[in-house]
Regions:
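Long, charge-dense
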Residues: 91-152
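Residue-identity detector for threonine
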Residues: 5, 37, 66, 102, ...
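Conserved mixed alpha/beta catalytic, RNA-binding, or beta-rich assembly cores of soluble enzyme
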Residues: 2-114
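N-terminal donor/sugar-recognition subdomains of glycan-related enzymes
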Residues: 1-27, 141-170
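Well-ordered, non-membrane alpha-helical segments in soluble/globular domains
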Residues: 45-47, 70-72, 125-127, 158-166
Length: 170
């Protein structure tokens, strides 16, 4: 059996500001919760979901509101922690930006030479602020655990479901 070693994240980890909680730096899991409201109006059930994720062992748990800068920040924060191998995507899709569908397309297809997310249908699915190397490293480093495929909206935001997926990844 191969020995798994854990790396200490850099001193300034996570490098990007954002609306997230930091948990166990040595965990292989980050949780991305889609946000369908403004940051100052985050519903209690979504705030609780991020707390549950960190308490269940996630390295990071936070919100994704936009398909461009939001995804770029997630990529930077995840790549900065080499221990993260799984990204759990959950929550409720935002009507305007479709960050969930865009994140799914990014995980599945990557970007073209102009950093356009292949297969994305959102308005601005470009990742201009990070290098192609960092983008590719994220895609090689992580596997998407997608809860958005569930038709049941409650299941996509169910704390027990998120805990079970985190435990399966750990």
């Amino acid at each position: 059996m191969r020995k798994v070693t854990k790396a200490k994240p850099p001193e300034l980890y996570p490098p990007e500001d954002g609306s997230y909680l930091r948990g166990n730096d040595y965990s292989p899991v980050a949780v991305v919760i889609l946000l369908h409201t403004d940051y100052d109006k985050i519903p209690a059930f979504l705030k609780d979901l991020s707390k549950v994720a960190v308490e269940a062992g996630a390295a990071l748990a936070g919100f994704l509101q936009t398909e461009k800068i939001g995804i770029e920040k997630i990529i930077c924060d995840v790549v900065a922690n080499p221990n993260i191998r799984y990204v759990i995507l959950c929550g409720v899709e935002s009507a305007g930006h479709h960050p969930g569908k865009t994140f799914e397309a990014f995980a599945a297809n990557g970007v073209d030479d102009n950093r356009l997310i292949i297969g994305a249908t959102s308005l601005t699915p470009y990742l201009h602020n990070i290098s192609l190397e960092v983008i590719e490293r994220f895609r090689k480093q992580t596997k998407l655990m997608n809860l958005l495929f569930e038709d049941d909206r409650k299941l996509r935001t169910d704390p027990e479901t998120v805990k079970r997926v985190i435990n399966a990844c750990i």
